[in-house]
Structure formats: structure tokens, C-alpha cells
Amino acid sequence: MSFASDMKNELTRIEVDEENAKAELSALIRMNGALSLSNQQFVINVQTENATTARRIYSLIKKVFNVEVELLVRKKMKLKKNNIYICRIKARAREILDDLGILKNGVFTHEIDETMIHDDEMRRSYLRGAFLAGGSVNNPETSSYHLEVFSLYEDHSEGITQLMNAYELNAKHLERKKGSIAYLKEAEKISDFLSLIGGYQALLKFEDVRIVRDMRNSVNRLVNCETANLNKTVSAAMKHVESIHLIDKEIGLDNLPDRLREIAKLRIEHQEVSLKELGEMMSTGKISKSGVNHRLRKLNEMADKLRSGEPIEL
């Protein structure tokens, strides 16, 4: 199972009281439900491709409204041939939609009904239902961090975004071709959302992966930085050695001033060491890294003049 499927499976096992069951059910039916007319009677069909979500819808309807629910299974014929699970409610359909704030005065509304989110627990339950109905989250082991909740209706998607941001999740809203999404991109905010809706096992797994990824990224950055510094050091040392060999060939190292002669010989003998270490090897007394760099730069300048045929002052 995918990370998102495991998470939804966990969410469907959360025990809720009747009030919070209504809030969760309101999101599930608003986002995955459809109303039809059969034998001059309204029928609600709530559809999902997730078996555990279908069982959740079934149990919540029985818990809150105690009506008969048919559970149908159909085979999807296009693309992925997944099963489609349909919870069908024939009795009291209009009353149920009214009670869940989906139907008002005979008109369907896309906004979240305030009675469904009037306290903290109900807001969490509504967001849990919204995620079960239209949510997805990337596997943190293989992808960039991303969690989203899809809704057919822009007004409803904006409401979900606002609901998320009531918990300072920095959620964004985006219109898609066939609907809208509320989404999170920050790992920390995704963790907060998982905790918010009760996905604690998913949260632990997400945080474990996140810690390992962050550590790996930190190590990679450190290694890259160290490698770059090492390459820079080696390149500079090679240039120093090349310059010193040229000076030795053309005028001889023994003809250099004392302060340049010793550093030149040390660089030839100890090509692998840092400038700081070279400075500590000076027989005339330890000199700083900048002091060593200054003397080696003088040798490079001297070699450049030899290459161009310019006169040198010793």
C-alpha cells in the first residue's frame, strides 16, 4: 500500500462521537456524493476507490442517521481498473443533506456550513473527512513534500484552505482543469496537518523519513562544500608548485630572498598540506595563513613575469 493509502486506512479507524461524525460525513458526502432520482425518490450515492473509506462512510451514516445503506462494488473500466465502492442511501436523503449543511432551503451549497465546524474538534473532523474524500500526499521517501485536497468546487476548496490556515498551515489554493486544490508544500506544515486530523502513525513515519532525508541532505551539502574546498586547495597548490619549479629552473631558489626561499622549498616538499600548516613549519617562526598566502602569491607573480619575459627584482 502507498503512504497515502496507509494513512487513510489509519484515519478510518478513529473513534468519533456523533457530532464529529456529522462533520466528517459532511465533507465526505459533499465531495464524493451525488444526488439522483429513482422511482420519484431522491437517492444519495457516495463514491470512492478506497475500500476503507467506503467502510468509514457506511459506518458513519449508520451511526448518525441509522438508515439502510447499500454498499455496491463496481469495476472501473478506464485506465486503472480499480474497484469503485458506492454507498447508496435511499431513505431520508433530503433530510440527511439538510442536516449535514449540504442542502439549504432546497438549494445545494458549495461553502462549508458553519454548524459543521463550530468548534476545534469538528474542524479537525471536517478536514479529516475532506482528506479521506479528496486528499493525497506524496511518499516522503521518494518525492518532494506535497499534500493536497481536491474539490470539484472552488468555493469549497477555498473554504478548506481557510480552514487549514486557521491552524497556521500556510495552505495555498490552486485552480485545476477539473476542480481546485488546497495544498501544502512545507514538510513541517504537512506534519502538523497529519497530527491535526489524527494520523499519528503516518506522522511518525513521515517524521522518520524527514529526519533521515534532512540529515542526508546536510551531509551531502557538507561533502560538496568540503570537496569544493579541497579542489580549490589542490588547484592552488599545483599552481604554486608549477611556479616554484619555473623559478628554480630560471634563477634558482637559492637566489630568492630568505622569506620567499623557505616557503618555496616547504611548498615543494609538502604539497598536500594546507597554508596554515605551511605557516607552522617555518623555521624563522610561525606565520599566519594570510602571511603564507601573501608569499606564495609573490612567487606566482614572479613566475608570471618570467613567462612573459618581464624583468624581476629580487
UniProtKB/Swiss-Prot annotation:
Keyword list, A-Z: Cell cycle, Cell division, DNA-binding
Disulfide bond entries: none
SUPFAM superfamilies registered for this protein in UniProt: Homing endonucleases (SSF55608)
DNA-binding segment(s): 274-308
Entry-linked Gene3D superfamilies: Homing endonucleases
A GO BP annotation: cell division
MF term (GO), any: DNA binding
HAMAP family documented for this protein: HTH_type_WhiA
Protein purpose: Involved in cell division and chromosome segregation.
Family that this chain belongs to: Belongs to the WhiA family.
Protein name stated in the entry: Probable cell division protein WhiA
Gene behind the chain: whiA
